Amino acid sequence: MRLSISKLSVVMLALPILASASVLPRTGSTGASCGSTTSGQAQCCNSTQSNTTPLPFPLSVITGLLGIDLGAITGLVGLTCNPITVLGLGGTNCNSQAVCCTGNTFNGLINLGCSPLNVAL
């Protein structure tokens, strides 16, 4: 059986495309850990504030509906946060406040029990 160069080229170009389209299940956590001393996840928050500062209008309503007592929270409250996937590697960029949040998170809208991370991202 004889393969032409064009057929061989098509096969060679198709292999990387098929390999990159393969779906593999994720295992473990999707966020970077804050270090060996805490069980929190590294987050990049648009803003952080003290638990004694009143939240802006829509967030204050949400915390009230969820029954969150901000006075009982230790640490900062992170607002509009996204997980930092890998610390120290290219592609990770946090132009706002990088924090480690050890409390509850509500889909990144509100993260509780946060402390600042002192790393260059």
UniProtKB/Swiss-Prot annotation:
Glycans are attached at N46. Its main location: secreted. It is found in: Secreted; Secreted, Cell wall. GO terms for cellular component: extracellular region; fungal-type cell wall. Pfam families: Hydrophobin (PF01185). SMART domains: HYDRO (SM00075). It comes from the Eukaryota. The keyword Heme does not apply. Keywords: Cell wall, Disulfide bond, Glycoprotein, Secreted, Signal. Residues 1-21 form the signal peptide. Induction: Expression is negatively regulated by the basidioma development repressor lfc1. Expression is positively regulated by the cross-pathway control WD-repeat protein 2 (CPC2). A CT-rich motif, which is often found immediately upstream of the transcription start point of highly expressed filamentous fungal genes, is present at the expected position. One additional CT-rich region is also found upstream of the TATA box in the promoter region. The keyword Glycoprotein applies. Disulfide bonds join C34-C100, C44-C94, C45-C81, C101-C114. CDD domains: hydrophobin_I. GO terms for molecular function: structural constituent of cell wall. Self-assembles to form functional amyloid fibrils called rodlets. Self-assembly into fibrillar rodlets occurs spontaneously at hydrophobic:hydrophilic interfaces and the rodlets further associate laterally to form amphipathic monolayers. Belongs to the fungal hydrophobin family. Aerial growth, conidiation, and dispersal of filamentous fungi in the environment rely upon a capability of their secreting small amphipathic proteins called hydrophobins (HPBs) with low sequence identity. Class I can self-assemble into an outermost layer of rodlet bundles on aerial cell surfaces, conferring cellular hydrophobicity that supports fungal growth, development and dispersal; whereas Class II form highly ordered films at water-air interfaces through intermolecular interactions but contribute nothing to the rodlet structure. This is Class I hydrophobin 1. The gene is Hyd-1.
